[in-house]
A protein has these predicted regions:
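Catalytic loop of the DD-peptidase/beta-lactamase superfamily, centered on the K-T-G motif
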Residues: 19-62, 249-407
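Secretory targeting and sorting signals
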Residues: 1-22
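Hydrophobic (often cysteine-bearing) scaffold residues that line and stabilize catalytic clefts
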Residues: 30, 34, 83, 87, ...
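Short, solvent-exposed loop/turn elements at domain surfaces
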Residues: 60-62, 70-73, 140-142, 353-354
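Short, surface-exposed loop or secondary-structure junction motifs
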Residues: 121-319, 323-325
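Residue-level preference for non-acidic, small/hydrophobic
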Residues: 38, 57, 88-91, 95, ...
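Short active-site loop at a secondary-structure junction
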Residues: 47, 70-130, 176-185, 256
Length: 407
């Protein structure tokens, strides 16, 4: 959920010796190893980082660095964080519960439910499944909205109606024929929210609350709506393409069901574990959720995007999850399919550059920590930051890269 470019296209191809190693056991996390990798993130330039790692029945929560640049307050692991596009996994799960209930079909044309919003041939051709796996061919409205600091200033204080966000995306040139190819678009998930409302007659965020947040007791997770603040303990949110600026107060209605949510690392791990354990969806529907399309067809090792969730090959097996990027907060939440390894982590700074930039040292340090958490027994954890593989960010991919002009 961001105006930016990809952090890195793929995880690097590793030597055969690394790939051949057995996956890590579900034993107790190596706290010293994790602490060293986490501490390296603020040392590389991030104000603060927080994380929760779960291995089997053992949890490790920690933070490093500063919550604010303007006052000496350390980052705390329980702080709430804007999770951006990880919102999509919650929303997709709610849509798929409607599928399980027989109230909606994945291959229903969107125009069946939203005839006035997506009229005509496009409404007949684009299906619910295409929205959820980003193969609809509908443009990404955020690319049209964000082109300068002035635009960001306006977004920060503006309340957007979901229908207006969708209209912006539909007015953009198609990114491809419906169903033809993956092209990440926030418009798809605003439409998914409108679908929830059309089917249930209820507010989409309220349906996510009722179906997912309340049953799982995710008390640190919410849709803030038009409230620009983050309720409860939180850090600053520093947007830094041209110098750090705190954007922790932001009207997130521009993200709505594509990227509005706030959560904690503990809540994210609880949610994804319940999802992948089959507690939220039927086995058949969960299987469809995980059946993905290539994110970069020319690079199969980049992983696949399912229905609101993506797969990521690593040296110790496949992980599932999502990342999120909004102004000032970046988040990853990644999980092994069997539930023995989970990591959710966030940093309180974001930067976007035109084109395909070389990774910043703090990008590399953070990804090194994430890989250490996922693969503690592989040789990834012993690599230097300069040679560590890089994780993809679907929220910052080519074609999802509105450029921010200098102020």
């Amino acid at each position: 959920m961001a105006a930016g470019v990809m952090l890195a296209a793929t995880i690097a191809v590793l030597p055969a010796s690394a790939a051949a190693q057995p996956g890590p056991s579900a034993g107790r996390p190596d706290r010293a190893e994790l602490r060293a990798a986490l501490t390296a993130v603020p040392e590389a330039g991030v104000p603060g980082v927080l994380a929760e790692v779960r291995q089997g029945r053992h949890d490790w929560r920690a933070a490093a660095g500063q919550a604010y640049l303007t006052k000496p307050r350390p980052m705390q692991p329980q702080m709430r964080h804007r999770i951006g596009s990880i919102t999509k996994t919650f929303v997709a799960t709610a849509v798929l519960q409607l599928v399980d209930e027989g109230r909606l079909g994945l291959d229903d044309p969107v125009g069946k439910w939203l005839p006035d919003t997506v009229p005509g041939e496009r409404g007949d051709q684009v299906t619910v499944r295409m929205l959820l796996n980003h193969t609809s061919g509908i443009g990404n409205y955020t690319n049209a909205m964000i082109d300068s600091y002035a635009a960001i200033n306006q977004m920060q204080v503006t309340t957007y109606a979901p229908a207006d966000l969708v209209a912006t995306g539909l007015a953009m040139p198609p990114t491809g024929a419906p169903g033809a190819t993956f092209s990440y678009s926030n418009t798809n998930y605003v439409l998914a929210g409108l679908l929830i409302e059309a089917v249930t007659g209820n507010d989409a965020p309220a349906e996510v609350q009722r179906r997912i947040l309340r049953p799982l007791k995710l008390t640190g997770t919410s849709f803030p709506g038009t409230d620009p603040t983050i309720r409860g303990p939180h850090s600053g949110a520093y947007f830094a393409p041209f110098g750090a600026r705190d954007l922790s107060e932001f009207n997130m209605s521009w993200g709505w069901t594509a990227g509005e949510m706030i959560s904690t690392t503990a809540d994210l791990n609880t949610f994804f574990r319940a999802l992948l354990d089959g507690d939220l969806l039927s086995p058949a529907t969960l299987k469809q959720m995980l059946d993905g399309v290539p994110m970069l067809p020319e690079l199969p090792e980049a992983g696949t995007y399912g229905l609101g969730i993506y797969s990521l090959p690593t040296p110790c097996g496949e992980f599932w999850g999502h990342d999120g990027a909004v102004f000032g907060h970046l988040t990853y939440s990644l999980h092994s399919r069997d539930g023995t390894r989970q990591v959710s982590s966030g940093i309180n700074i974001s930067h976007y550059q035109v084109g395909l930039p070389d990774p910043h040292p703090f990008d590399i340090a953070w990804q090194t920590f994430l890989l250490t958490a996922m693969c503690p027994t592989s040789d990834v954890s012993s690599r230097s930051a300069e040679t560590a593989p890089q994780l993809p960010s679907v929220t910052r991919m080519p074609g999802n890269d509105a450029a921010v002009a200098a102020p």
